[in-house]
Amino acid sequence: GYLGQQIDIFDQTLATNLRLGSADAGDEQLWQVLDSVGLKDWARNQPLQLQTPLGEYGQAISGGQARRIALARLLLSPKKILLLDEPFAGLDKKSREALWQMLVQHQQQGILIIVTHHLWQTDQPINIVQLPEPDVFI
């Protein structure tokens, strides 16, 4: 699965956007994945909860919320290899750290590849590939 820098949020409900990752996901699965990406409390506080409309291109939500919804959708999919392009963009430090911990947990179930310009110290085992020049491809 792939999560790019451009996030696709559709003019549908939160549940419908999430189920694009797994059409047969039940409400309990949706709540679990929302908890994983740090949006469960936000969704619970919405009057329509899972039926909250997100607006055209996600106009009813913030950029950080859109990124987390797209990530939640990806985590619902059965894919074992995830490629995330700048998944921490637009997130504050606390949100980045929470997302990092969630991704590390998910990595135990498959392969996680993160493309980023920003690295920070972590006690998690990771492999880093640094490209020496911008036009070098691996």
PLM regions with names:
Residues 15-55, 101:
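ABC ATPase nucleotide-binding domain helical subdomain, centered on the C-loop/LSGGQ "ABC signature"
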Residues 65, 71:
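Hydrophobic anchor residue at the start of the ABC signature
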Residues 78-80, 110:
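A residue-level structural signal marking coil residues immediately N-terminal to beta-strands
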Residues 82-86:
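Catalytic Walker B motif of ABC-type/P-loop ATPase nucleotide-binding domains
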Residues 93-94:
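Helix N-cap at the start of a conserved alpha-helix in ABC-type nucleotide-binding domains
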Residues 102-116, 120-123:
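Conserved catalytic loops of ABC-family nucleotide-binding domains
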